[in-house]
Amino acid sequence: MKELNDLINEQVYIESLDDFDKHILQHISIEYRPKSWILLEKFGIYPGLEETANAVYSKIYQEYSFTKEYKAGKFELTMYKKDFEGIPNIFFEKLHLKVDLTKDSGSSYVGNFSTLGDNMLFDCVTIEINVGLVEVEKYLMHELLHAYQDWQMQLKGIKRFVLDRDSLYSKIMKPTKQYYETVLSAILYYTLKSELNAYCAQLSGELKMIKDTIESPNDMVKALKQTDSYRGYSLLLNIVNRYDRNELSKEEIDIVTNKCNEILNKSRNAEETFKFLKKRLESSIRKLDNIIGKLCTENLNCSYFTAPSNLFSNYLF
């Protein structure tokens, strides 16, 4: 049974959430009650994450053959707990990988296949990964972090991490031909707390890959501005700022405003909508700032200088 202080702390945390995050929690198919799983591991990275991703990456390229023809450009492989001997926090008995060789697909954790076994590990974790992606390891870290979050929730009795078709998440990620609807979806997606955790894990992987090129604070800034996380937030924030600069047409403004109201069940006007979106993005960027110095210290050869504060927000705001 949980200590009284734990329950109090969880309730305080839930009450501190803004309406957007509460709305998300109420629309996903999990029990809505105080739950400390939202906090998860510090920085969204658990011990063993990088080693697990590296082992998976190595296995993919051991199995892949440049001379073999693959049906529909895909192949599948399975790894077992014993394949990760010596790596901490292996939370599954089996890891099933669906590997796509095309350049147009992304990566995803397929959570509906994850169920707890008698030993309290997932029987099987399924991840879809595209080996056409640059720096595959960081995407593996991203999806493994989602799987780990799911495992943590199910250990604590949360029903599912998988979301209903009619959930807010599904509405956010619904494919669309409208460019600004896609932008809106990306903004809402990037500011989900679960995604921010995963991007922290991904950013950690990106930093490790470039650590040998970092010799000064200027090198660090240049490197960080090339990461997917920085470029993604920069692009989205710039589009929102175009509204403030009167660079969006009425049609573009109406598309974003109407779609945002539809998804969130609100009736905001255009000014309120763009102010809300900008606030969401800036809040997420500041959260990345809070952990970036720690990540730089852990992942880069920079013990002899201090990581500049507010790295992301200094260059984005």
Question: Predicted regions span which residues?
Answer:
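Enriched but not universal
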Residues: 1-15, 312-317
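Auxiliary, metal-adjacent structural segments of Zn-dependent hydrolase domains
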Residues: 18-121, 132
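Post-HEXXH active-site segment of zinc metalloproteases
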Residues: 134, 150-184
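Active-site recognition of the HExxH zinc-binding catalytic motif
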Residues: 138-151, 198
